């Protein structure tokens, strides 16, 4: 007989109780951050978790690997976190990897203009009252305090509105702050992007003050920060992680999933077993045919250069009026990120690498001779953060009572980010622990 017991949730702030079956199995399909965060949260309260991953490694679009062309271990994409990303920080605390992020003690963002050679810093004060906008030394050059009031429109924007319909996408504030920040966060050119998602970015960053807006980077790589410690945590709590294990079909009965088909391997589900489907947005509808999910995606391009950064270079530099958009400085390399990069999908890599390096050399004062380089084009890095695509994001629950969705493409209220992925996994785990499935 399977028993249900009430257990306090160490990860939750509420006083509510959890319904936990002592011997049911939670099958998590996908070992990206959404799946790993769900698995970690469930394992932390004693649930039996089995993670099934198609690839031979975990992490999905958030992982590290050794690149022979550079002779270095790199991330498949550069990711910036903020100190106010409570789900991501909480996840790292749980798996014992909070010390893997590094950043300034204050909220400081450095920018450079390739066209004029100008440089400036945005310096937020710690409190929620944004007195920094009244300081010329802290706000964006050529802007006035009242210019920032325009951002309030994003906080109340409806789901159908684009950024260009809500704020003026011209002028110093837009070109020197809004466009770089929103382009990076949304991975879409802001004028056509979802104003609602842009509002969420502003609400969770600038509007919360500098204490929540310190930039943080995984200096030793995403794998060392998020993936390897999560796998160790899961295995230490009895979870099973199966790689090279592709889910090919779900047996979808009237109100529940009855079985999981992994080729010749078929797992029949017990009456209280649960499935968390944490696969990419383009895969989920092939497994759940009636599922509505985003259909358009945007690329991100990262260029890595095997060279020691010069002294004094900030760990992250925002760039305007160039191909380069963000320059990240690591101990053994310089890395450039370009968002909404579909225009480069078919571009020849070598000329593009030389173009990017010429900008990096100008920004850093390094020799113009290009070092060893490697370009990664992630063609479906994020769902397209457009109003119509945002409206297609499903909630976590499905009409099958033991099938739950997770992923940054679900309706988290945030764009496609690490924080969104982890929140979706946490939400899926919360549904599991607070719902009776039998």
Locations of the language-model features?
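Mobile amphipathic helical/loop "lid" adjacent to a hydrophobic cofactor/ligand pocket
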Residues: 84-203, 212
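Helical element adjacent to the flavin cofactor pocket in flavoenzyme catalytic cores
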Residues: 201-263
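Conserved flavin/dinucleotide-binding core of flavoenzymes
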Residues: 2-13, 123-125, 327-438
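Glycine-rich FAD pyrophosphate-binding loop
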Residues: 43-68
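Extreme N-terminal leader/targeting segments of oxidoreductases
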Residues: 1-26, 44-45
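N-terminal Rossmann-like FAD-binding beta1-loop-alpha1 element of flavoenzymes
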Residues: 24-51
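Mid-domain catalytic core of redox enzymes
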Residues: 2-9, 245-365
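Glycine-rich active-site loop/strand segments that organize a redox cofactor
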Residues: 62-84, 151-152
């Amino acid at each position: 007989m399977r028993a249900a017991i009430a257990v306090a949730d160490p990860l939750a702030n509420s006083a509510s109780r959890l319904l936990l079956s002592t011997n049911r199995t939670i099958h998590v399909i996908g070992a990206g951050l959404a799946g790993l965060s769900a698995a970690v949260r469930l394992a932390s309260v004693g649930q039996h978790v089995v993670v099934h991953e198609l690839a031979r490694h975990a992490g999905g679009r958030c992982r590290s690997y050794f690149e022979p062309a550079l002779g270095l271990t790199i991330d498949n994409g550069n990711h910036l976190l903020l100190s106010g990303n409570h789900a991501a920080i909480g996840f790292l605390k749980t798996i014992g990897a909070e010390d893997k992020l590094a950043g300034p003690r204050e909220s400081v963002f450095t920018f450079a203009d390739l066209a004029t050679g100008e440089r400036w810093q945005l310096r937020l004060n710690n409190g929620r009252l944004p007195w920094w906008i009244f300081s010329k030394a802290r706000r964006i050059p050529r802007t006035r305090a009242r210019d920032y009031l325009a951002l309030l429109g994003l906080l109340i924007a409806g789901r159908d509105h684009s950024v260009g319909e809500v704020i003026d996408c011209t002028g110093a504030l837009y070109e020197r702050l809004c466009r770089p920040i929103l382009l990076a966060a949304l991975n879409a050119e802001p004028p056509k992007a979802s104003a609602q998602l842009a509002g969420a970015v502003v609400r969770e960053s600038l509007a919360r003050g500098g204490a929540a807006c310190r930039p943080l980077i995984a200096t030793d790589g995403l794998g060392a920060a998020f993936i390897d410690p999560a796998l160790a945590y899961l295995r230490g709590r009895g979870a099973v992680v199966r790689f090279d294990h592709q889910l090919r079909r779900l047996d979808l009965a009237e109100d529940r999933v009855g079985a999981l088909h992994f080729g010749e391997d078929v797992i029949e589900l017990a009456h209280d077993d649960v499935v968390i489907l944490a696969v990419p947005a383009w895969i989920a509808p092939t497994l759940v045919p009636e599922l509505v999910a985003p259909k358009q995606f945007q690329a991100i391009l990262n260029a890595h250069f095997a060279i020691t950064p010069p002294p004094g270079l900030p760990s992250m530099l925002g760039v305007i009026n160039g191909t380069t958009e963000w320059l990240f400085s690591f101990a053994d390399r310089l890395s450039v990120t370009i968002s909404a990069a579909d225009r480069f999908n078919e571009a020849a890599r070598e000329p593009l690498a030389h173009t990017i390096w010429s900008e990096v050399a100008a920004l850093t004062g390094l020799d113009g001779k290009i070092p060893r380089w490697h370009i990664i084009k992630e063609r479906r890095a994020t769902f397209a953060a457009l109003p119509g695509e945002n409206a297609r994001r499903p909630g976590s629950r499905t009409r099958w009572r033991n099938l739950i969705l997770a992923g940054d493409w679900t309706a988290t209220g945030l764009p496609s980010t690490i924080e969104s992925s982890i929140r979706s996994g946490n939400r899926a785990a919360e549904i599991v622990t607070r719902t009776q499935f039998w």
